Amino acid sequence: MEAADVIEIIKALDEAGVVVWLDGGWAVDAVLEVQTRKHDDLDIVLADVEGLLAALAPKGFAVVDGKLHTNFVLGDAGGRRIDAHVVNFDDAGNGIFQMLGGGEWVFPAAGFESIGTVAGQRVRCLTPEVQMQCHANGYEWTQTDFQDMRALRDRFGVELPEAYR
């Protein structure tokens, strides 16, 4: 996934009134305001699944994997992938994510307040603190995860989880 692809996708969603926040590697690069590595996909957090599907279908995107109510992947014929994480916002603005194995993950409302840049364009993204929290739970880190999380620590002073110090 190239920076131009990210901007094309975000622009299409903005024009359709679909609000998304970057997550994953592109969110790290967005808050750092520089692309630090290649990206296989675009991770997003959103509430409006139907709007997402309607906005991106004309661009050739369709669901290729996952469950629409929680986490799914959109793909196109060019091999671009969007990993969508669906939240429902509570009255306090927290994003409630239904985990596939049961249970809920709560994205705190303050975690949706970050703005970063991709290819000079302003984009919504999860805050560095919430990005670190997301990486702290649920899976073993790859070398790329270490690189991303260390970059957040070095730039923003966000503490690495104890298991990864």
Per-region residue spans from a language model:
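Compositionally biased terminal segments of proteins
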Residues: 1-165
